[in-house]
């Protein structure tokens, strides 16, 4: 009799009613997205629920593959599911569909650009001045996003001083197909630069409107295809090229790059003011050359002073997304076409770039959710 009872309990869950989809959703309503501050059920993240006896399987579809807390969310989901009476095993698969930038309509917005129809988010990486490792930051962020599973493109908008082709290794030069250009790929990332169409060792001598025309072609006549993020490496200044981009493409937001010292902040503030005037959200600040760790003493040395990025972020009410240390290997990798996040993923600078990429993706997701009405209000301040 005891044997029959045991068998019956194994088959029926000890007399408990079977686990239902409603039970699963009720349990997962306790799991909140840390950025959107809503539960993952009401946000529509929970998909493909499958219940087989005491095993529950499902997908949690996030708003970006670059979400740095996806493993934490997965663990929370599994823990909540195992609290349901009758659930012995929880199988949670984390997926992602990058949300599309849908800015609120304004008169200043450009018309829809067919060449960019498949691009979900366009992010400007800018500083207003040269020499702050802006291009290095753009390259490493692009690869950090790609490593997380995103489809990424990289546009070198510095017509007068293009450096991206030196910093990455693309498989072939850009090819012409009719009226459009097919960009080459550099280890999975689509890349375009004026240096691909000229002798890289010679100066590009163009008047401002002509330089703007080159960038307009890159935005309207390049087959970017389906991308989660198009990273635009901005040139120094606040002139024709910057205005052309804002008139041709709808930017999701801008990442501001600075070094710690005040002489950098003078020009960087002008770039921030430009984006505010153009009604482009500033997603945050990244500080490069923040410190150097000495091999001998293992201490941080603030060679270019300290706190500039933090002051800038506080001044404009945005987030300081990260501080990148000085590492000679970054410069070597840039010269040899080997991005630091690929060649030294465990290095402190690579981890910092990866963290910034994750924070940037989350900021874009928050902004997109707000524009779509998922959120009533939000703050771009990162804590």
Residue ranges with predicted function:
Residues 336-347:
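C-terminal boundary of histidine-terminating zinc-finger modules
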Residues 198-245, 264:
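Phosphate-binding/switch loop-helix module in NTP-utilizing enzymes
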Residues 42-45, 50, 63, 70-126, ...:
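Extreme N-terminal, non-catalytic leader segments
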Residues 8-47:
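N-proximal, solvent-exposed amphipathic alpha-helical segments enriched in charged/polar residues
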Residues 77, 228-229, 235-336:
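Conserved catalytic-core segment of NTP-binding enzymes
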Residues 121-159, 272:
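Walker A/P-loop phosphate-binding motif and the immediately C-terminal alpha-helix
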Residues 49-63, 192:
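Short, aliphatic-rich beta-strand segments
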Residues 145-208, 212-219, 310:
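Phosphate-binding loop that captures ATP/GTP phosphates
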């Amino acid at each position: 009799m005891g044997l029959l009872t045991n068998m019956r309990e194994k088959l029926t869950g000890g007399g408990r009613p079977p686990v239902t989809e409603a039970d699963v959703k009720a349990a997962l309503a306790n799991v909140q997205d840390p950025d959107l501050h809503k539960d993952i059920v009401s946000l529509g993240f929970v998909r493909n629920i499958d219940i087989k006896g005491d095993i529950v399987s499902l997908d949690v579809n996030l708003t970006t593959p670059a979400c740095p807390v996806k493993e934490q969310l997965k663990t929370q989901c599994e823990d909540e599911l195992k609290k349901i009476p009758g659930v012995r095993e929880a199988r949670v698969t984390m997926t992602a569909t990058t949300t599309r930038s849908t800015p609120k309509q304004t008169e200043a917005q450009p018309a829809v650009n067919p060449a960019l129809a498949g691009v979900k988010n366009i992010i400007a990486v800018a500083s207003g001045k040269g020499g702050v490792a802006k291009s290095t930051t753009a390259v490493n962020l692009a690869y950090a996003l790609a490593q997380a599973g995103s489809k990424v493109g990289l546009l070198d908008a510095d017509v007068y001083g293009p450096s991206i082709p030196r910093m990455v290794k693309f498989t072939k030069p850009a090819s012409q197909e009719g009226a459009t250009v097919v960009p080459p790929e550099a280890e999975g990332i689509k890349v375009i630069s004026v240096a691909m169409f000229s002798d890289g060792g010679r100066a590009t001598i163009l008047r401002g409107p002509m330089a703007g025309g080159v960038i307009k072609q890159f935005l309207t006549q390049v087959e970017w295809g389906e991308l989660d993020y198009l990273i635009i490496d901005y040139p120094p200044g606040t002139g024709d090229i910057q205005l052309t981009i804002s008139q041709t493409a709808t930017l999701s937001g801008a990442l501001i790059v600075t070094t710690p010292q005040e002489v950098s902040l003078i020009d960087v503030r002008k770039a921030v003011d430009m984006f505010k005037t153009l009604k482009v959200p500033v997603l945050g600040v990244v500080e490069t050359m923040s410190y150097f760790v000495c091999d001998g003493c293992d201490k941080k040395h603030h060679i270019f002073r300290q706190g500039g990025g933090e002051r800038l972020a506080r001044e404009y009410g945005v987030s300081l997304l990260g501080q990148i240390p000085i590492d000679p290997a970054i410069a070597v990798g840039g010269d040899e076409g080997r991005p630091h996040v690929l060649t030294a993923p465990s290095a402190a600078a690579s981890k910092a770039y990866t963290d910034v990429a994750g924070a940037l993706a989350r900021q874009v997701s928050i902004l997109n959710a707000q524009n779509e009405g998922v959120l009533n209000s939000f703050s771009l301040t990162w804590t």
